[in-house]
Amino acid sequence: PDTGVLKGYCYAAPWKARAAYRYTVETSIYLDANDRSKGFGNRLYTELLQRLQAQNIHSAVGILALPNPHSIRLHEKLGFEYAGCVKEAGFKFDRWIDVVYWQRILSHRIVSP
């Protein structure tokens, strides 16, 4: 049932400002800790990916702060592939955190500039 309580959200933003990267987006998803592993993330992300494909987006890059086993499992389940790690890229919770990149190619079509 719809309780009117926000369970989470996801969005996409341009990956880089330069025109050459206009077909790649950075994706983010946030879920309430009590609502993980209940299918909300899968439904949200699936809808986002469908909308991105409809907008002719070629590649989606999920950027995850570590540790984050729930988000890694979600990205794997949705067909993302591990694409790299940046060590100590951020600082939160009084410590340095590594960031990993997970990427999914949405379309192999060649787009005319």
Regions found by a protein language model. Give the residues of each.
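Conserved hydrophobic beta-strand within the GNAT/NAT acetyltransferase core sheet
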Residues: T27-I29, A60-I63
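Short hydrophobic/aromatic beta-strand or adjacent loop that forms the aromatic wall/cage
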Residues: E26, I97-Y101
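Conserved catalytic-core motifs of GNAT/GCN5-like acyltransferases
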Residues: Y11, V61-L64, E76, E81-D98, ...
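Acetyl-CoA-dependent GNAT
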Residues: P1-N34, Y45, I105-L106
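Flexible, glycine-/basic-rich loop-and-beta segments that form/coincide
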Residues: V111-P113
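Conserved acetyl-CoA-binding loop-helix of GNAT-fold acetyltransferases
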Residues: L31, S37-A54, S59, P69-K77
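Non-catalytic, surface-exposed connector residues within folded enzymatic/regulatory domains
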Residues: Y21-R22, K38, F80, W96
